[in-house]
Structures are given as structure tokens and as C-alpha cells.
A protein has these predicted regions:
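Mature N-terminal, pre-catalytic/accessory segment of carbohydrate-active enzymes
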Residues: 20-44
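Extracellular parallel beta-helix/beta-solenoid repeat domains
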Residues: 38, 44-554
């Protein structure tokens, strides 16, 4: 009888657990809504319909899981959600066609279960906006026709120029001597490329951004194109050239105004912008995230058109761990805020500040209660006091979306020297995150490895920087060009391995680890920029396998 009672209790307890799990989760099987893999059909309209249903049916305390079956899903612009997004460090071209637009979500998980999401045209694959406690996991993002054209050097003749062969997936045409890459609703011409060694996949030594003169080309036979004016003796037969533009309309994943986001086991194989761009978000964890090739046998040599991951004006803690970042055309990670340039001193408590860079404007900069400080642009001297925003409004627009200028009122009197004609910027200290960048591999990419510009603690540990063609780690800060804040006060760089970084020269790349704020008038600087006011910058227990390049520049 005693055993029977125990058995009944066990069964009841198990049932209660199942019931509790059922009540705490609402699972949406995408296949129940017509979203099935490997059919070659346009998933965009069906996905948009499902997301609207999930958004409408959200309930407090219930986790909503959108679950896909493994396989390939094709997304086209037709039937996709259209959104106006102003995205930091991207081209502000709108509207954008969004494959999966997750907005105003709470406790929602998108679980791909190994799904391969393939996009067509010029799309923003996934957005997560104004959401909390959400996640994306177990899926990959790619495009059917990348806007980058990969070609192979077949012959390099000093007199006849270069004979090259486009990769099999490049849908090209030659019109009036111009080589044109074609996709769904777009065409692309090129004048620059990134050369890769065809055997090692490393960016070739001392090539950087190579000019590729592919004007007046002729197609000698299908798949073989002669560029008589493209002459560069560094490019041997067998070299792979990644032809790229400077456009970056959208990242693969766009995050804005989110809180507590987890992205796990997501791979981005290509995007015309960055892999992931997060702005004005709090607490982000990337685990096993990759901007990477599809494996060692992938015939592509490239991934994203710009950075792998980028965090602009975030707060809380950013964790990026166990990731793979390779083949991207810019940095693996960049963490910063944005300076506004002071355009006008309205009164002793009020200024007008402006977003200055053409790829960073149109989004929120600050809120009432935020702490700010002023900086002199040409010396990067930070004024000693901090101020609290009592009021902030867009100045040149009715709403924050699309605004370049803000009128900002502060609690204390602003120093008399802060004037437009004196060249000052203002930094928001409240939107600056702590960072952990750990156990990641960064390899075979253009430009730099990891960039940090935040006064909060930064730990960079147990990473492998393998042939980053520029600086591996950069502590920057710039109130003159990119306008990316701010000073680093507490940085630990430990137990990392660096192999042959700095094989080419790019902006701010003076050593393997480069502490390089942009200071136009260094002689006029009165104080330091990075370090101090905290732990400072500690570099310990790292391994450097290098050639005749400096390890540290400051």
C-alpha cells in the first residue's frame, strides 16, 4: 500500500510538472501555419502573418516559442514586412524589407532547430525591436546572391592585365566593358577588392584595400574576363579577389531598444551590412554566435560586408563567448557610443547637439536623467564635471526617428568655453556597457579584430586572433570622424593568442594592440584620454606569434 501511494504521488507530481510546463510555454510550430522547408516557396508573407499572431496572443508569464523544422527557407522582398529603421553605422536607406520582424515582443524565442534562412534581393533578415527577455537560436542566415563578387586570378600578364574567373554562383554580365554583378532587383559594380591567398585563405600580405581597375573588360570566353587596365604584380595566379562596394544597407540581425536578449548558435554566412547590429539595448549575450563560412570546404572566402558584431549606445553587460568570426570585411566586434557635436549654445543650461557621421543618425541619443560629459574635439580633453539631462527633444524633426539634431537641457550651468566655434562634443555616459569577450576565434578578415570604447569594465580573454589583417585589438575614441565614444577606464586583456596580425595597414592600426584615440592636436592635449579613474589597461599572459610589427602602440 505504501509503494502504491508513493507511485500515485510520483505520477501526480510528473503530471503537475507537465501541466506547469504547458502553461508556461506556448509553442507555435511554423509548419502548422504553412511554413515548411525545402519547397523553394516565398516564406516572407507566411512568416509575417505568424509573427503578427504571436504578437497578438502574448500573455504575461508565458514563453512563446516560434519553432521551425530543419531545412531551407527562402525569403523574398515580395510579401515581406516593410519598416523604416535608422540603424547605427549603416546606410540610412528606407524602407527596408524585413524577413522576420520581431517587434514589441516579451519572452519570445525564435528556434530554428537548424533551419537555413536564405534571403533574396536586398533584405534585412531579422529585426528584434522594443522587446524584452527574447532569444534567437539554432539557425543560419545567408543570401542566395551575395552583393560581393568573388573572382579568381587565372593569369597576370604585365602587358595584357589580369584574366579572372568569377565564382560559379556569381551571376554577372559585361555591358560596354563593365563587369556587373547581378541579383534579384539589384546590380553592382566594383573598384576595390580584398585579395586572399587561394591556399591559406589569409588576406594577402600588404594588400589592404586594393584598387581593381575592371573598366573596359572583355569576355574572352564564358567565365573568363580580361581586365587590361588591372595591373598588380602582387596578385598571382590562384589568388582570390573579393570585389566589394562600400554600401551597407542593413545587417543580418538588427536589435534596438531591447532588454535581456540571448542569441545562441546562430550563424551568419553573409549580409550586405554587418552580422549583428545592436543599438540602445541592455544586456545582450551571444553564445556560439558565428559570422563564418559554412565549413572548411566552403568555396566562399568572405562573409559580411562590414563588422561581424557591433554595439552602439548600449548599456548593461554585453557577453560574446565561444564565437567564430572570419572572412568579414571589417571588425569582429565594435563597442561604442556616439558623440554629438555641439552646434549651438542656446543658454547656460541648453545646447544643440548633432549626429555628424552620415551612417550614424536618426535614432535616440539620450533620455531625461542620463549623465553626460563634454569633450574638446581636437585634443580629446574631457571636461571634469558631469551633468544630468533634464530635457531632450529632437530639434530638426518632429520625432526622434530620422533626427540628426537634439536640443538638450542640463541640470547645471555649462562651462562658458563649450561653444560651437570652439569644437566640443557631448557624450552620454549612461549608455555605456560592460563587456566580456571570451573564447572567440577571429581570423582571416579585413581591417581589425576587436574595438572597445567604453568607460565600463572590459575583459578580453582566451581568444584566438589569427591573421586579422589589421590591428587585433584597438582601444579607440574619436570626436572628429566616426564620432565614436569613449574613453576606456578598466580594460583587461589576458590569455589571448595572436598570430600574424597587422599584415596590412588600416585606420588606427599601429600595432597588434593599438591604444589609439584620434587626437588631431596631440601637442595641445592637457590630460590623458584612456586609462586612469579606475583599473586602467592591463595586458597580461598573452602569446604573440608575429613578424617585424610592434606588439603595443599607445
Amino acid at each position: 500500500m505504501k509503494h502504491l501511494i508513493i507511485a500515485i504521488i510520483t505520477i501526480l507530481t510528473s503530471s503537475m510538472c507537465v501541466m506547469a510546463q504547458t502553461r508556461s510555454e506556448q509553442i507555435y510550430e511554423a509548419s502548422d501555419y504553412g511554413i515548411v522547408p525545402d519547397k523553394g516557396k516565398n516564406t516572407s508573407p507566411l512568416m509575417d502573418k505568424l509573427i503578427k499572431k504571436v504578437q497578438k496572443e502574448q500573455k504575461a508569464g508565458i514563453k512563446s516559442i516560434i519553432r521551425l523544422k530543419p531545412g531551407r527557407y527562402d525569403f523574398h522582398e515580395t510579401g515581406a514586412a516593410q519598416r523604416t529603421y535608422y540603424i547605427s553605422n549603416h546606410d540610412q536607406t528606407n524602407p527596408k524589407h524585413v524577413g522576420i520582424a520581431l517587434e514589441e515582443m516579451s519572452n519570445v524565442i525564435l528556434d530554428g532547430q537548424g533551419a537555413q534562412l536564405v534571403f533574396h534581393g536586398r533584405m534585412l533578415p531579422i529585426s528584434l525591436v522594443r522587446s524584452q527577455d527574447c532569444g534567437i537560436q539554432n539557425l543560419s542566415i545567408d543570401f542566395e546572391h551575395p552583393h560581393i563578387a568573388q573572382v579568381k586570378v587565372v593569369e597576370n600578364n604585365p602587358e595584357k592585365g589580369i584574366l579572372f574567373q568569377p565564382a560559379p554562383w556569381v551571376d554577372y554580365k559585361v555591358v560596354k566593358g563593365e563587369f556587373i554583378n547581378c541579383g534579384e532587383g539589384w546590380e553592382m559594380k566594383y573598384s576595390f577588392g580584398i585579395p586572399f591567398d587561394g591556399d591559406t585563405r589569409h588576406v594577402m600580405y600588404n594588400t589592404g584595400d586594393t584598387r581593381c581597375n575592371i573598366n573596359e573588360v572583355t569576355e574572352e570566353k564564358p567565365g573568363l574576363i580580361r581586365a587590361p587596365h588591372w595591373k598588380d604584380d602582387r596578385l598571382k595566379a590562384g589568388s582570390i579577389i573579393v570585389l566589394r562596394s562600400w554600401e551597407r544597407p542593413a545587417p543580418a540581425i538588427f536589435m534596438s531598444h531591447d532588454t535581456n536578449t540571448c542569441i545562441e548558435r546562430v550563424k551568419v554566412h553573409y549580409a550586405e551590412g554587418m552580422g549583428l547590429l545592436a543599438q540602445l539595448c541592455e544586456d545582450i549575450t551571444l553564445t556560439g554566435f558565428g559570422v563564418c563560412l559554412k565549413g572548411v570546404d566552403d568555396p566562399r572566402f568572405f562573409t559580411t560586408q562590414a563588422d561581424a558584431t557591433h554595439f552602439s549606445g548600449c548599456k548593461g553587460k554585453i557577453i560574446s563567448q565561444d564565437g567564430l568570426y572570419e572572412g568579414m570585411m571589417d571588425d569582429a566586434i565594435n563597442v561604442h557610443g556616439t558623440y554629438l557635436r555641439i552646434m549651438k549654445r542656446v543658454d547656460n543650461h541648453t545646447v544643440i547637439g548633432r549626429y555628424m557621421h552620415d551612417q550614424s543618425w536618426g535614432f535616440e541619443w539620450g533620455r531625461k536623467g542620463d549623465q553626460v560629459q563634454f569633450i574638446r574635439s581636437n585634443t580629446m580633453d574631457i571636461l571634469p564635471d558631469t551633468y544630468t539631462i533634464t530635457d531632450i527633444k529632437p530639434y530638426d524633426k518632429e520625432t526622434t526617428d530620422g533626427a540628426r539634431e537634439f536640443i538638450i537641457t542640463l541640470d547645471k550651468e555649462i562651462p562658458q568655453r563649450v561653444k560651437a566655434e570652439e569644437g566640443y562634443g557631448v557624450e552620454n555616459l549612461s549608455w555605456a556597457p560592460e563587456v566580456l569577450f571570451a573564447r572567440n576565434t577571429i581570423r582571416n578578415n579585413r581591417a581589425r579584430g576587436a574595438l572597445f570604447s567604453t568607460p565600463q569594465p572590459v575583459i578580453v580573454e582566451d581568444n584566438f586572433f589569427d591573421h586579422t589583417s589589421g590591428t587585433a585589438i584597438l582601444l579607440c575614441g574619436d570626436c572628429n570622424g566616426w564620432y565614436e565614444t569613449g574613453a576606456c577606464r578598466d580594460v583587461t586583456i589576458r590569455r589571448n593568442r595572436f598570430v600574424n596580425a597587422l599584415t596590412s595597414q588600416y585606420q588606427f592600426t599601429s600595432a597588434i594592440i593599438s591604444i589609439y584615440p584620434e587626437i588631431p592636436n596631440l601637442r595641445g592635449q592637457e590630460g590623458f584620454f584612456h586609462g586612469g579613474n579606475g583599473k586602467g589597461i592591463v595586458i597580461e599572459d598573452n602569446e604573440f606569434d608575429t613578424f617585424d610589427k610592434p606588439i603595443l602602440y599607445a
